[in-house]
A protein has these predicted regions:
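ATP-dependent carboxylate/acyl-activation modules
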Residues: 1-180
Length: 180
């Protein structure tokens, strides 16, 4: 669908409430973006629930992301975006914990994506890795795999033995039930 995230087109003008009503009523691949826009123009969570019939819990989760987007953008407009600014480092980390990509941050902060990546690396804002418990804690997994996150901590256990890296593409994802 050509989106880089929930706020896929940060510079676009927001539609009117009337335009959004039509976009919100019918489930489709673009409705999530209309929900974001509706939140930005002032629809309440109750209104969105009535129109979309989406559970309020999910709407609150989306609202948290939309609110964080605003905080990230506003911070960049009012503050120095340099690695020696501890507040900027905290906002950058929080943005990554919320799942904002370097490309999204570049769009919001009107900077090249490479500058965001360099800033992130310079401030130590890098992903960590957590183990996917494929055996439901019943026994030790001998072929563990990991997912990346920006949460604190790291569960990777390095060993002094030969290693194999499997690169692949396609529809395989965590939770699909395909074990390697």
């Amino acid at each position: 669908i050509g989106a880089i995230g929930l706020g896929s087109n940060f510079r676009a003008a927001l539609p009117s409430r009337e335009e959004l009503m039509g976009k919100l009523r019918t489930p489709n691949s673009r409705r999530m973006f209309a929900i974001r826009q509706a939140m930005l123009v002032g629809f309440t969570l109750e209104e969105l629930h009535e129109i979309t019939l989406i559970d309020p819990w999910f709407l609150r989760q989306i609202k948290e992301i939309v609110d964080m987007e605003g905080q990230i953008r506003d911070f960049a407009l009012a503050n120095s975006m340099t690695p020696d600014n501890p507040e900027m480092v905290a906002v950058l980390r929080k943005a990554k914990e919320f799942g904002f990509s370097d490309r999204q941050l570049a769009e919001m902060w009107k900077k090249p994506e490479g500058d965001i990546r360099a800033l992130r690396r310079e401030t130590g804002t890098v992903p960590t890795y957590y183990l996917v418990d494929t055996c439901a804690a019943e026994f030790e997994a001998y072929t563990p795999y990991y997912y990346s996150t920006y949460e604190k901590g790291d569960e990777v256990q390095t060993k002094d033995c030969r290693k194999v890296l499997i690169l692949g593409g396609g529809p395989n994802r965590i939770g699909q039930g395909i074990e390697f």
